[in-house]
Amino acid sequence: MTASTASAPLAFGDLQGCRTQFQQLLAKAAPPADAPLWFAGDLINRGGESLAMLRDIIALGDRAVPVLGNHDLHLLSVSAGIRKSKKGDTIDEILAAPDADDMLHWIRHRPLAHYENGMLLVHAGVLPQWDVDLTLELADELQRALRAPGWKETLAGLYGNEPNRWKPGLKGIDRLRLTCTALTRMRFCNADGVMDFSSSGGIGSAPAGFMPWFDVPGRKTEEITVVFGHWAALGLLIRDNLIGLDSGCVWGEQLSAVRLAQSAAERTVTQVECEGCRADVH
């Protein structure tokens, strides 16, 4: 089946353990059986059905195309003793499951970025200085490090806000940390690609001199379609070459999915309400 005749992917925002709402949304969107299902990361945590949610996605096999989000990496870090569970986390049932090792192995082998048919899927964003090729190269470096025998040491070194800007000469763990920060945590940066982490609010909460990563003039991925999640306060954002899918399901808002047709005019949005998955802690 060629790309031109295959069913368009259906891309979902952050699920965060909201399994019931995911099932409702999948039934409502009713994609063809051969349609790939893309997930913008944060499959688990904060919602009450994280274990069942994770098992459902794994059971989809190759049809599921998830990228890693910060909550997925947090689960790996807690499992490795690098981080401790936080108030509001709902990952203990995963860690206590008899098949925990298999599930954690599966998560550790998911990509940080996926590119197909002119569409790039990431969890949080792409630095404005990165084109598609560099984004995929950097994501691949981090993916291989997380799949290697020394993955725990790598994972422990990914936390922190420095370096906060891209430089081609970055090497080692600094390079991997910068890649992870951009792909899984970024919201705002300035025109030079310096990231800011002081705000997780909507566009209006940008610190002086900063803007959403996707609004930086001359962004090198502006000619392709970038699909992302992570930014619940932003809400659903649909532009011709930009699709922000985190509409705050775990905040009791909505869970969103978009049919990723090649033509922006043919893309369709499906949503369900998420009042039943409101978490106590955000």
Swiss-Prot record:
Q: Which Pfam families match?
A: Metallophos
Q: Which InterPro entries match?
A: ApaH, Calcineurin-like_PHP_ApaH, Metallo-depent_PP-like
Q: Does the keyword Hydrolase apply?
A: yes
Per UniProt, the keywords (alphabetical) are: Hydrolase
Keyword Hydrolase: yes or no?
A: yes
A GO molecular function for this record?
A: bis(5'-nucleosyl)-tetraphosphatase (symmetrical) activity
- Known role: Hydrolyzes diadenosine 5',5'''-P1,P4-tetraphosphate to yield ADP.
Which HAMAP family is this protein grouped with? ApaH (MF_00199)
Its recorded name reads: Bis(5'-nucleosyl)-tetraphosphatase, symmetrical
Source lineage: Bacteria, Pseudomonadati, Pseudomonadota, Betaproteobacteria, Burkholderiales
Question: What gene does this protein come from?
Answer: apaH
